[in-house]
Amino acid sequence: MLQNSELLHEYLPIAIFFGIAVLVSGLIMMLPNLLSTKKYNKDKLEPYECGFAPFSDARSKFDIRFYLVAILFIIFDLEITFLVPWAISLNTIGKIGFFSMMFFLFVLIIGFIYEWTKGALDW
């Protein structure tokens, strides 16, 4: 078992790397705001729409179906995120890993069928 000093010695390079990464990314985000010249112009503050004046307010309401499609995309994107590492390590995880992923896919398929039957995907 590792002692506290050995544990600190093992994780010190990771902590230093994380600290440098936070410092550099913060510096990269703050430096342009500090060094740039700010020239405000009325034309720069207006919305731009293909060279024309905007036809309507940019804050118009979207149909809820767009949000449903976006949520479906996120759900199935997460499914692929879990499915690829599972497929790669299928030989080592055994039957428990196989059946747990089958249960996960079953729940997703049931949810998809429910949305389909309720008409969430009909336009």
UniProtKB/Swiss-Prot annotation:
Annotated EC: 7.1.1.-
Membrane topology qualifier: Multi-pass membrane protein
InterPro entries, A to Z: NAD(P)H_OxRDtase_bac/plastid (IPR023043), NADH_UbQ/plastoQ_OxRdtase_su3 (IPR000440), NDAH_ubi_oxred_su3_sf (IPR038430)
Broad EC category: translocase
Any single GO CC term annotated in Swiss-Prot or TrEMBL for this entry: NADH dehydrogenase complex
Top-level taxonomic group: Bacteria
Keywords: Cell inner membrane, Cell membrane, Membrane, NAD, Quinone, Translocase, Transmembrane, Transmembrane helix, Transport, Ubiquinone
Role played: NDH-1 shuttles electrons from NADH, via FMN and iron-sulfur (Fe-S) centers, to quinones in the respiratory chain. The immediate electron acceptor for the enzyme in this species is believed to be ubiquinone. Couples the redox reaction to proton translocation (for every two electrons transferred, four hydrogen ions are translocated across the cytoplasmic membrane), and thus conserves the redox energy in a proton gradient.
Family: Belongs to the complex I subunit 3 family.
UniProt name for this protein: NADH-quinone oxidoreductase subunit A
Species in which this protein is naturally found: Rickettsia typhi (strain ATCC VR-144 / Wilmington)
Lineage of the species this protein comes from: Bacteria, Pseudomonadati, Pseudomonadota, Alphaproteobacteria, Rickettsiales
Gene name tied to this protein: nuoA
